[in-house]
Regions:
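Membrane-interface extramembranous regions
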Residues: 2-136
Length: 136
């Protein structure tokens, strides 16, 4: 493990790093919006949570919002991006399971968490040389 930390990261063009930040920015924007609308329990959020079979009291919604925003902030900050990506992957797995349990449409609803998770990791791969070094 120590050799990975001391190994020089592979060089990459500025365009790929920029693309990684753009992809990550889209993911961060989506997840931050999702978390923020749960902090202020709007009626559409409450209705969706009820349809999914989750508690709809404001405290539960705010807790869920914090559970989304925390890892999203970790993902946005370079030093903790890997930890944030792992936590968000776990969260998105739970979202996929909830959609699957409800019998939601497969390609548009159920697999949306998979699509978002793939973008999350692709963005991190392009913007984080240490992750590229680890995977080579």
């Amino acid at each position: 493990m120590a050799s990975i930390a001391t190994t020089a990261a592979p060089q990459q063009g500025r365009g790929a790093t920029t693309a990684g930040w753009i992809i990550s920015g889209i993911v961060i924007l989506f997840l931050a919006t999702d978390g923020l609308i749960k902090l202020v329990p709007l009626q559409p959020v409450t209705d969706t949570m009820r349809a999914l079979g989750w508690p709809t009291n404001p405290l539960s919604l705010r807790l869920l919002g914090v559970l989304i925003l925390g890892p999203t902030l970790l993902y946005a900050w370079r030093r903790t991006a890997l930890v944030g990506a792992i936590l968000l992957t776990a969260f998105l797995g739970g979202a996929v399971a909830a959609q699957l349990r409800m019998g939601a449409p497969l390609l548009s609803h159920t697999l949306f968490g998979v699509y978002l998770g793939a973008l999350l990791w692709i963005g991190l791969y392009f913007r984080e040389p240490r992750l590229r070094a680890l995977l080579r």
